Amino acid sequence: MGLMNAFDSQTEDSSPAIGRNLRSRPLARKKLSEMVEEELEQMIRRREFGEGEQLPSERELMAFFNVGRPSVREALAALKRKGLVQINNGERARVSRPSADTIIGELSGMAKDFLSHPGGIAHFEQLRLFFESSLVRYAAEHATDEQIDLLAKALEINSQSLDNNAAFIRSDVDFHRVLAEIPGNPIFMAIHVALLDWLIAARPTVTDQALHEHNNVSYQQHIAIVDAIRRHDPDEADRALQSHLNSVSATWHAFGQTTNKKK
């Protein structure tokens, strides 16, 4: 029996004993593209197509599943969003391994929508505080001399960028990225990058002078964090980090209040 015929041959038990209080309503049928997507995903997960291997051509998939080209293309696009295939112009889809970035990226739309709701930014800032608090404690306990040197280099770039707001923001993100790299967990890195991207995108536009004052405060707080990590003092590193992020949160909240009053 062909694949699509197998889908179509499924029967439903019409016994009245099922859910006496349920109202009669038709069940939504899956789109052909969703059925093709699910079958291809299972084939990939069963290693019928290995990592780096190309899938059959669109024409071959159309014949195999007995569907049209749009259904095949929609299915492949969905697999690409999941990180299961790569699609380059003029080439057949190639099986790939989902990365932590792919997994977190799937949440991006929902996260940005959540940030736009009342209290959304505060919730994400709290998440960042809990997350980075664990990172600095780990760094203070386990960071190698080489990793501490990388933090010091990031701090130096931070210092050199104080008079350039755009450069300072980049160096600020890089400083916290080095912290996230210390445990060596790619999921931590993906979460950290996404969190900062989402929060920075939600920040209001402020004057260069206001940002310059904020940059100097942040830089001094970064120094305190690195000093505590260098002394391998997790409690002090945690206190310095929490003081820093609470200050950042309060500052950007004040910026937002000022911006709203001017509107």
UniProtKB/Swiss-Prot annotation:
Entries under PROSITE patterns matching the protein: HTH_GNTR
Domain named HTH gntR-type: residues: 30-98
CDD domains named among the record's database cross-references: WHTH_GntR (cd07377)
Protein origin, superkingdom: Bacteria
GO MF, any single term: protein homodimerization activity
Keyword field: DNA-binding, Repressor, Transcription, Transcription regulation
GO process annotations (BP): DNA-templated transcription; negative regulation of DNA-templated transcription initiation; positive regulation of protein-containing complex assembly; regulation of DNA-templated transcription
Disordered: region residues: 1-22
Notes on how activity is controlled: N-acetylneuraminic acid (Neu5Ac) inactivates NanR by converting NanR oligomers to monomers.
InterPro entries: GntR_C (IPR011711), TF_FadR/GntR_C (IPR008920), Tscrpt_reg_HTH_GntR (IPR000524), Tscrpt_reg_NanR (IPR023730), WH-like_DNA-bd_sf (IPR036388), WH_DNA-bd_sf (IPR036390)
Disulfide bonds: none
Keyword Transcription regulation included in the entry's annotation: yes
Pfam family, one: FCD
Binding region for DNA: 58-77
Keyword Ribosomal protein (UniProt): no
Quaternary structure and partners: Homodimer. Might also form higher-order oligomers.
Function, in words: Transcriptional repressor that controls expression of the genes required for the catabolism of sialic acids. Represses expression of the nanATEK-yhcH, nanCMS and yjhBC operons. Acts by binding directly to the Nan box, a region of approximately 30 bp covering the promoter region.
PANTHER family linked: HTH-TYPE TRANSCRIPTIONAL REPRESSOR NANR, TRANSCRIPTIONAL REGULATOR, GNTR FAMILY
Family the entry assigns: Belongs to the NanR family.
HAMAP family: HTH_NanR (MF_01236)
Protein name: HTH-type transcriptional repressor NanR
Organism: Escherichia coli (strain K12)
Organismal lineage: Bacteria, Pseudomonadati, Pseudomonadota, Gammaproteobacteria, Enterobacterales
